[in-house]
């Protein structure tokens, strides 16, 4: 029974790989979210969605992307939160009403949605920005679609992530891990959190643990509420 179970699992995994390979032959990029696969077609540069069984094929974008090349698909927790980052560093956001990809910003290194789905963070080599995805009626008030410059540095910014509270950011500048708040009233507080050679950072939101990797060594810190 165990052998049959293991064999069945192996066949299932190989079947999934074969299906993913079938999609990859006709797509530029693909990303798996749950049991759904999002991919950009090589033929028409539109975004599509299917499942692991390839039982359906749904066109997400109404019009093709404005440029050709390689892309990265970035998804939020909500079904309509989709951005695409091109190899030319152009960030496109899918308009959930028109279903058309609109250029949000050029020169973008990376982008991430907040866990609560209310914000999109994107950064370049020297700037960090926030796009608000819904109205904020409490202070500080924000409107849907409003963009805000959070910080700017002369040194290169290599990575940025949300804190689990979605109200603070951690980011890497040189060998320093810094933190900053999104609330820009009065004076925005930005502090040096840690110093480490070429650090890479990650938050486990559920366990509220901050990880950073430096010189092939992984460290963790438990966040206090």
What are the language-model segments listed below?
Residues 4-23, 44-65, 87-104, 129-150, ...:
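Surface-exposed loop/turn elements that mediate protein-protein interactions on large endomembrane-trafficking
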């Amino acid at each position: 029974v165990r052998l049959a179970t293991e064999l069945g699992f192996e066949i299932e995994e190989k079947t999934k790989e074969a299906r993913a390979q079938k999609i990859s032959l006709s797509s530029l990029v693909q990303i798996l979210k749950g049991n759904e696969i999002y991919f950009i077609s090589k033929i028409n540069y539109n975004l599509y969605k299917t499942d692991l069984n390839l039982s359906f094929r749904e066109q997400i974008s109404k019009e093709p992307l404005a440029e050709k090349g390689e892309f990265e698909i970035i998804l939020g927790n909500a079904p309509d939160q989709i951005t695409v980052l091109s190899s030319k560093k152009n960030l496109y956001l899918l308009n959930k009403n028109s279903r058309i990809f609109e250029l949000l910003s050029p020169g973008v290194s990376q982008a991430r949605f907040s866990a609560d789905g209310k914000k999109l963070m994107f950064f370049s080599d020297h700037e960090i920005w926030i796009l608000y995805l819904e109205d904020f009626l409490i202070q500080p008030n924000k409107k849907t679609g409003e963009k805000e410059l959070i910080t700017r540095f002369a040194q290169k910014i290599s990575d940025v992530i949300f804190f689990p509270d979605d109200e603070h950011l951690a980011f890497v500048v040189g060998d320093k891990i810094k933190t900053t708040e999104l609330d820009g009233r009065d004076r925005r507080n930005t502090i040096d959190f840690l110093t480490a050679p070429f650090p890479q950072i990650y938050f486990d939101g559920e366990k509220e643990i901050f990880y950073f990797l430096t010189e092939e060594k992984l460290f963790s810190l438990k966040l206090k509420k």
